[in-house]
Amino acid sequence: MVYEGSLSFNLFPPNNYFRTMHFIEVYGLSTNFMRYAYDFVLLDKENRKYTGDGASELDYYGFNKDVYAAGNGKVVYASNDHKDDKSFDVTKLKKNPLELYGNCIGIQHKNGAISIYGHLKQNSLMVKMGDSVVSGQKIAAIGVSGSSFFPHLHFEVRTSIMNAAEGLPSYFSNIYALESNMKIKSGFVETGSIVLTK
């Protein structure tokens, strides 16, 4: 039974066991490292993500815009050679689940958590494995590499860079939630929220 608002749906026949799963589980991955992941899309003042018809990545406001480190840490993963062509080979996931993100950076922070920045622009990485970074440092540019339909930044925090990683919640500071006209000093961002950075 699934509850949505005031409607209840009888989705399954009675007396059966079901388990939710993600498509990548068939490739040997059984954890939910994207449980608290975000896809950030840059908008104009009219909340549009692109100009024209959006047929080219160049039409998108976010394409080639700077990406900054969310916190101090050390680069533990860096991939820079995926094309910005929306191509993705799902069979590579078993060897490396980070293939989902195309060009990608993983930064390990003092508490052990790792922040992931995915779908970065080919050859835009300004850091490499082993580099130390500081919060707010420019590290790359937004692209459309990996399993991406349009230019955006995939951001998540996880327990490990390896396959057994679990997703961790992210807290954001100094942003405005435009729908509620409220400043968020520190807290969560809801999926679908439009926020203004300050």
Residue spans of the language-model regions?
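Acidic, glycine-rich catalytic/binding loops that coordinate metals and/or anionic ligands
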Residues: 1-8, 18, 94-97, 125-131, ...
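Non-catalytic extracellular/periplasmic "stalk"
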Residues: 1-60
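Zn2+-dependent peptidoglycan hydrolase active-site motif and core
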Residues: 61-62, 70-121
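Short, well-structured beta-strand-loop connectors
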Residues: 67-78, 126-141
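A residue-level detector for short acidic-glycine micro-motifs
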Residues: 77, 119-122, 141-144, 159
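Histidine-centered catalytic micro-motifs
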Residues: 116-121, 150-158
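Short glycine/proline-centered loop/turn elements that form peptide/ligand docking sites
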Residues: 126-128, 144-151
